[in-house]
Structure formats: C-alpha cells, structure tokens
Amino acid sequence: MYKETDVGFTIVWFSCVYSGAQGNPIIAIVPTFIFLLLHFSIVTDHLKQEIQLIIISIILGLVVDSSFSLLGFVKYNGTLDFAPNLAPLWIICMWAGFTAQINHVMKFLIGKYLLICFYGLLAPLAYIAGEGIGAAIVKDTYLSYGFISIAWSISLLSLFKISEYLMSK
C-alpha cells in the first residue's frame, strides 16, 4: 500500500504543479479526487480520522499558503481573480494529497518530532521545483525560504500531532 500511496501522491504533486503552471484547476482536481478515493477505499479501518485529518490539513494549507502570498513571499499562478492572495485550488489539492501519506508512507516519522521538523525545513525544495515548472514565483528568496521552512516545520509537526490524536480515538 505504501508504494501505491507514494506513486499516487507523486502523480498528484506533478498534476497540481502543472495545473498551477497552466492556470487550469481541473488538472489538479481530477487526479487528487481519484487519489483520495483510492486512499479512502484502503483506509477503511480509520476512514473517519483520515477524512478529519485531510479536512484540517486543507484548512491549514489554505491559511499557510495564503499567508505566504499575503506577505509577498510567493506569487502563485492559477489564483482566483477576485482573491489573488488566496492559495489556489492546486495548492489545496496538494495539501490534501500530501496529508494522505502521513499515516502510511510517512508513518516512520510518527513520534520523531525533531525529524518531522527537519523535513519541514526542506519544504523550500518543493517550492523551488514548483517555481521551475512555472507554478509560482518565490520573492525575496532568503527571507521567503526561511519563512517557508519555519512555517512548514510547524505545520508538519502540527499535522503529525493532530494525526496521533485522531488515530488514538
């Protein structure tokens, strides 16, 4: 199951970034929807908790990535005309797909809080890749990447702690 989840998220990630580069949200929505349906069909023993975690992640992602835009660190392609600082749909899809891996592909990180924070510090690598594909532009590079690293470390740690809480119910 881990291999399928990893491959599935890789497809979701590339679809989301390509969606941003093309400004077409359908390119992100369809693969993410299929991936999550397959994911939910596999995790039937803790389906409710997985859905709750992904919903929380979507809200967190909306806040975090919208903050990056509002603060002028990142300019995303594919945003809504009437809300240009709101994180675009393709970013939200990416958060949902990413979070589906926490209790599966990333299960080895559960309880390893320093390692989780370290992985969060590596988040700028994904933004660099997305920028290279044309999905976003990162401004004021050092400050932006520093802020992204810290925000992702906190976000990733929070998602793992929330997951631990939900899965213990």
Per-segment meaning from a language model:
Residues 1-169:
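Aromatic-rich, lipid-facing transmembrane alpha helices and their immediate juxtamembrane interface loops
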